[in-house]
Design a protein with these regions (language model features):
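Class I SAM-dependent methyltransferase Rossmann-like catalytic core
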Residues: 2-53, 65
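S-adenosylmethionine/decaboxylated-SAM
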Residues: 50-308
């Protein structure tokens, strides 16, 4: 009932915009698709954890709510502040209609239409730190990476298989065993189930390093080098059997806290919905409920999707 009410309120532009404006003011959040807890994590990581043994890469920076706290924290850290390193900020910088919800309650509401370029907005928001940010505008599948070691890889760009394969192929080879951190910002989001299959595939190389509360972000430490044949493979739905899907999601569900269980469970349902296998999706949804996963958050979202013809 509560989740249904929240969804209805979101459909009112005025109510949703007012709520988002008050929420950001109260929590002192930057405008973006990140929570205050995520923004705080990036700042603390930059200040306290970064060691200077590799580059910092932000895949999917949008309006800078990941980039800005990262740089603010890093500038308090001599390993970054006394170096010539920059944060590499990747984005298409092309506006899509679904972004309007995150812009609600700001001067950006209604400013951009589908297909507009907003890189100047990013530059305006990050101008204080411009000399420590290198903007990589465009399709990361085409831009790629230069090959330098990466110490911190923030991934908010695995929105489909092509992008996921590009991140694995172009960025994972530059991770440093025992040093690198990978933060998956969509790990606990229903739409991106391939993240779970890939992290399970690479489970011998990554160690779970925690999660960011009140967010969809989960953190991994890179421990062992991934075999070249695994990095160069072109993954797809067809790459995995149903048994492997079960194993991958059992792995993920055992990693995360109770807070994130409904969203990870929803991603498993979405694995089948993405392939138009509705009966399998419905059966999986029922199985997850029988396992005691609460019907809330993203699991409620996929329930509504299953109820639509």
């Amino acid at each position: 009932m509560l989740q249904s009410l929240k969804n209805k309120l979101k459909k009112s532009a005025f109510i949703h915009g007012t709520y988002m404006r008050l929420k950001r003011a109260f929590a002192q959040e930057l405008v973006g698709m990140t929570s205050k807890t995520e923004q705080d994590y990036f700042a603390v990581y930059g200040e306290k954890t970064y060691s200077g043994k590799g580059e910092i890469v932000d895949l999917g920076c949008w309006l800078g709510s990941t980039t800005i706290p990262l740089v603010k924290g890093l500038l308090k850290n001599p390993a970054f502040a006394e170096s010539n390193r920059k944060v590499y900020a990747y984005d298409l910088f092309i506006w899509f209609e679904w972004m309007n919800e995150s812009a609600a309650g700001t001067r950006l509401a209604g400013k951009y239409k589908e297909g507009d370029n907003f890189v100047e907005e990013f530059k305006a928001r990050t101008k204080e730190f411009a000399r420590r940010i290198e903007i990589r505008e465009g399709d990361l599948k085409q831009i790629g990476w230069s090959g330098e070691n990466i110490e911190f890889l923030l991934v908010d760009a695995m929105k489909n298989w092509d992008l996921a394969n590009a991140v694995v192929r172009d960025f994972y080879p530059s991770l440093v065993p025992g040093e690198s951190i990978v933060l998956h910002q969509d790990y606990a989001h229903f739409f991106t189930p391939w993240i779970h299959l890939l992290q399970w595939t690479f489970r011998e190389s990554f160690a779970f390093a925690g999660e960011v509360p009140k967010s969809q972000s989960v953190i991994f430490r890179y421990e062992n080098k991934i075999a070249g044949e695994l990095l160069n493979k072109n993954y797809s739905f067809e790459s995995f059997s149903d048994r492997e899907v079960d194993s991958a999601f059992d792995y993920s569900l055992n990693l995360v806290s109770t807070e994130k269980l409904p969203n990870v469970a929803a991603a498993k349902v979405m694995w089948f919905l993405h392939q138009n296998e509705r009966e399998k999706a419905k059966a999986e949804f029922e199985n997850l409920l029988k396992r005691g996963i609460p019907l809330e958050k993203d699991l409620f979202v996929v329930k509504e999707m299953l109820e639509k013809e």
